[in-house]
Amino acid sequence: VYKRQQSLYYKNELKPIKEKLTVLNGIDVLLEKKLHFIKSRKIALVTNHSGIDKNLIPNYKRLMEVEDVELKVIFSPEHGLFGESEAGEKINYSDIDELPRVISLYGGTRKPSAEMLKDVNLIIYDIQDIGARFYTYISTLGMVMESASEYGVKVLVLDRPNPIKGNMIEGPILDLKFQTFVGYYPIPTRYGLTIGELALMINGEKWIDGNPDLEIVKMKGWTRDLWYDQTKLPWVKPSPNIPDLNTAIIYPGMCMLEATNISEGRGTKKPFKKFGAPWINKIELSKELNNLNLPGVVFKPITFIPTPIKGMSNNPKYKNQVCHGSEIIVTNREKFNSVRTGMK
């Protein structure tokens, strides 16, 4: 991963950012300068609500407007085409008439079949990722690439920023003995690549079966050292429980609480920022955590009640119970290490 970061696919400027920078995502570069990639193509689009252009128009609408382009099918990842579903929820789009055929790749079907790709000669992948290994959108990417290789379909990845920067790495590399859909590649927890760079690495390192014909539409104006809010791009929460960039920064480490008996804050308006349980002493916990002097972060004692929130968490841990714990407050995101903090 570090070698790929140094490959200068995107530059690492390391200069002070005085104002927000204009960045064009892959979808905008495609539509403005690379239309020859999709002309006369029959397309399968892998996307969700985050697949928008610079004017917030969904990519599927833009593609349907292009002459001599036929959008045959849309594949949606976890959380659905419109980001309407909480983690793990299965989705059915059979009743939507105004769109091309929409097929969920989460649930019983996670790889496009030969029937699903019938008459398709190009797969476009365009989803905003978060930069954490256990975000399942990147697992969907690999499985789509496997199907593309098996059925001889080209893959075009429209690149988007890594919102938590492209020059930082945190956490251990996954041991493939524990490979699941939630951890699919031997990469660090926070891997510091864009989705396009990761696609190239997946192919180059042979982490999937086959070797699909792969091409990346690079962004324009993005550099590795940029946080998402240092661009002029609007924030669209990539999944229901990542409402803002600060949550995305905290997520790689604090998501590990999901596997414990501690609430990770689902069922509140601050998932992953709040954590606790009914039996915790919030004062003592916050004191102990602050005494660790972890860089770039402080902990505030809090009380909260996880409750069902439609589209975010229907059945949160400790539902309707009073929980005591801490709120994590990042004071210096350049020094903050989410994974180290989560493990502490």
Where are these regions (language model features)?
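C-terminal and late-domain segments of enzyme folds
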Residues: G26-L31, K39, T47-H49, N55-I57, ...
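Glycine-rich oxoanion-binding loops at beta->alpha junctions
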Residues: A87-V120, A132
